[in-house]
Amino acid sequence: MQKYNLPLWRVRALIAAGWEIDAHTITHPDLTAVDDAQLWREVHGSRVALRRMLHVPVEFFCYPSGRYNAHVIDAVRRAGYLGATTTNYGLARPARPYELSRIRINGSDGVVGFEHKLESVAP
């Protein structure tokens, strides 16, 4: 494991506290630039590894660096994920479960910054 990864006991503590754990590949490649075999290892293999280690459902995927295309979406769908998040800013739309937008919150945002981000996407 890389030095910035959480120890397994901390991940289990997050799960016990109600956090959901989802997949993000094994080696963080640009999935639009890898061959089919590596694409499958990254997408399916990360799900299998997390389920094996943590004994929890792994139902969503996050595209590394936000890079994806129709071929990558197809692999994510075939691997059994219910949806995937992108780096696109905005509210998630249920009509596009494999292209879910999100609002990135940083530690430096503070309460006012958090409120501003929510207001910027409010319907």
Model-derived features: positions:
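C-terminal active-site subregion of NodB/CE4 polysaccharide deacetylases
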Residues: 1, 11, 16, 20, ...
